[in-house]
């Protein structure tokens, strides 16, 4: 059983996971470094991690969740929150709520400061999720599956655009 307490100061954030490395023309805009906290302390229904973002970068594309709710707590650094059609300055101590919804709740945290930005990310971890990406017109369908034999997370993942839609009866 995992010990239910961990101190953020004791967490080491390593280099980005190569499996999650961004690709494409805008790959240099992203810095994806995070340390899982939830599994280390035995959480089952909430996900949390420590996220670190370099100056001028963001951690993920502008997106919304149809099932999950997220909350972020800014620990260090300055940045900006894109939220729906608005932008808001961020600084240490800010708490951000991102409820489930459509494009009106799409969000992205951008480090606009000169030092690393560190924040705690929390999520309700819905087992089945649909995310929408307004900037690219994509959506993703995700489902958590049982871990593999080595204990690694396995996930169904499919990304598409709405114009890729097929008729329900096509090919049946």
Regions inferred by a protein language model and the residue ranges of each:
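Conserved short histidine dyad/triad with adjacent acidic residue
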Residues: 31-36, 49-65, 100
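A short, N-terminal "cap"/entry segment at the start of jelly-roll beta-barrel domains
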Residues: 1-45, 132-172
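Ligand-binding loop in jelly-roll beta-barrel domains
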Residues: 100-129
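Short acidic-glycine-tyrosine-enriched beta hairpin
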Residues: 85-101
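Short, conserved beta-strand element in jelly-roll/cupin
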Residues: 50-55, 65-82, 122-124
């Amino acid at each position: 059983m995992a010990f239910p307490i961990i101190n953020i100061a004791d967490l080491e954030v390593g280099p980005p996971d190569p499996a999650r490395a961004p690709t494409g023309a805008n790959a240099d805009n992203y810095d994806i470094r995070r340390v899982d906290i939830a599994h280390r302390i035995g959480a089952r229904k909430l996900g949390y991690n420590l996220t670190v973002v370099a100056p001028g970068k963001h951690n993920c594309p502008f997106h919304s969740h149809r099932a999950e709710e997220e909350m972020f707590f800014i620990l260090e650094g300055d940045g900006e929150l894109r939220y729906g059609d608005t932008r808001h300055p961020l600084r240490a101590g800010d708490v951000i709520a991102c409820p489930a919804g459509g494009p009106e709740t799409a969000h992205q945290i951008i480090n606009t400061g000169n030092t690393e930005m560190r924040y705690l990310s929390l999520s309700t971890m819905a087992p089945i999720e649909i995310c929408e990406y307004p900037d690219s017109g994509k959506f993703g369908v995700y489902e958590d599956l049982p871990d593999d034999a080595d204990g690694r997370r396995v996930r169904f993942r499919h990304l598409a655009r709405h114009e890729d839609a097929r008729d329900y009866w096509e090919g049946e």
